[in-house]
């Protein structure tokens, strides 16, 4: 059994800056907003949903079963199965892949999948289980430890990005130019209304008065492009990665509704896209930056599609050098990659991003009369995930 899988709805929340507009909304509540938005967009009764699969990376303090929380907060029945996925930055994409697999083999007919993260609310840890025998107790930043640090050599992810820049001879100037272009593309896309169809608002409760509705991304306006070339490197002494040519710390969620083509026909729902193929890849952890260049060819092969047949690509810009290196390795045209900007400007809530780039890709195909799209995202530990879709 290998049923055709279609995406019938795909949305994301606005992405909030670190300690910004969405900083008080938990990851699960952000996920709920995305799930509800995805279902409401197609007027789908939640009773039809068999399962919810959501990526979420740093789960400390979020509470038991974050995906289950998001499902219930979105108003789905208690009978809906819920699973949380942690594949670091690729979690949201892996959730979509697992949803597709469940539908392909007949385990489910309708699955909501995506990802969510509130990086502003990630706590600090202190080991007090056995007590501090003497002197002060040391606090550990959960965001740094569980989200942004290699588990094997304890280096920041940015150290690996600097290594990648050296290996592929990508200059500081190239990275800064890439970052500036990312910000400019995002600003143009927002000004042209190109994100209007994919973004659902989030109501943020206030201490007094009515909730504030957050409707737009924050980060792409929080930049002075003229200052980018003057910033210092932040990870290694002779490095080229800066705060501006890397993605930032953020809050947000994305959700997609997947179902079998037969079920979509039964419910009278028009597919947005078909899932053609997907794949994962792994290599040595310090080279996670180029793992998308290993995962994407595998996904294309499974989809029966050549690189040249792909109209548009979405690569998660964890760092500018990630986009540049993978385009270099794969020989891609920059005009076909992240045409509405990428994570450097649209930002990178860890568990959300893998799903977010699929949502954006669907809209890019629609806006630009494209047919085939491919998305790929690297993840800490040496991995990456990639997916190929075809506009319906």
Can you name each region flagged by the protein language model?
Residues 1-26, 223-290, 294, 301, ...:
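Condensing-enzyme catalytic core mediating Claisen C-C bond formation in acyl metabolism
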Residues 87-117, 165-194, 255-262, 327, ...:
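Active-site-proximal alpha-helical scaffold in enzymes
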Residues 12-13, 24-33, 41, 174-262, ...:
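N-terminal extracellular/periplasmic Venus flytrap/periplasmic-binding protein-like
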Residues 159-162, 195-198, 206, 276-345:
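Active-site pocket-lining segment
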Residues 56-110, 151-156, 222-248, 329-356, ...:
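Conserved catalytic cysteine-centered active-site region
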